């Protein structure tokens, strides 16, 4: 097996530490542990080019710290589900603006189909190369694939 060429951070915000168990009617019954296998199925041999590093925090400061660490480590890209901070955090948006890491915003549910109007806005998306939402846990694998293609075609 070859050495991965790309390091991607899979960053998850508040209340996303129990995916697969938390509100399965909204977020599905599959957890993040399924993502590497989904990436392999979706991308085939190209999946071997990617190292995935998963991090979840319930606090805004810890997410900012991890983004800054990714910047310092020259991480190649970020798949970011900021959870509720998507709709409220100027601090995370400001961090993404300065670290300038290629980022795909990801959501398990379709935030624009949710009933709460606040969930229809994103401070994260304006600093992302793209947004993937509404495909359950598969949204993460789709985001990894999109980020990989974005970086390879930049």
Name these PLM-found stretches:
Residues 46-94:
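Helix-adjacent hinge/juxtasegments
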Residues 19-34:
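Glycine- and acidic-residue-enriched helix-capping/strand-helix junction motifs
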Residues 4-8:
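Extreme N-terminal starter segment of soluble prokaryotic enzymes
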